[in-house]
Amino acid sequence: MRIRMNAPTFDHVLIVASDLERSIEFYTLIGFEHLETIQRPNDRVAVMRLGGVKVEIMNLPEGEETLREPRRLTDLGFRHIGFKVYDLTSVYERLKDKISFDSPPRKIQGRGNRMTVFFKDPDGVEMHFVQE
């Protein structure tokens, strides 16, 4: 499939974090590269990269409140972030004492040999590793 010159391409995702340093440590642990931290008048943004994708992590600005309600599988909008890995068992073994997984790796019903394991970042953003 050819990409047209004026067609949009993916640039970044922004995640708001309650503790920027803790989030930088977490995302680095799961494989992201920390490119830089930008200080702006009211907040700081850590620019992270995994493969060719950038994720910006912004600290919750001072004095701002946030509301985090548990999401249901059927809620509209953003659900989770999936990361492809080539050896899910070794990734799980390396990280299981450092982050909290929902369960050990398991097969995805109806998807052949595809396996997955879910976890959350320090602020509850749902993620999973998947192996084809």
Predicted regions and their residues:
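Vicinal oxygen chelate
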Residues: 17-21, 75-123
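Active-site beta-strand termini and strand-to-loop segments that position acidic
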Residues: 48-52, 119-122, 132
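Exposed loop/turn and edge beta-strand positions of beta-sandwich/beta-sheet ligand-binding modules
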Residues: 9, 42-44, 51, 77, ...
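Core segments of cupin and vicinal oxygen chelate
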Residues: 15-55
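A detector for short, charged/polar N-terminal pre-domain segments
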Residues: 1-5, 70
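A short, acidic/glycine-rich surface segment
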Residues: 43, 64-69, 104
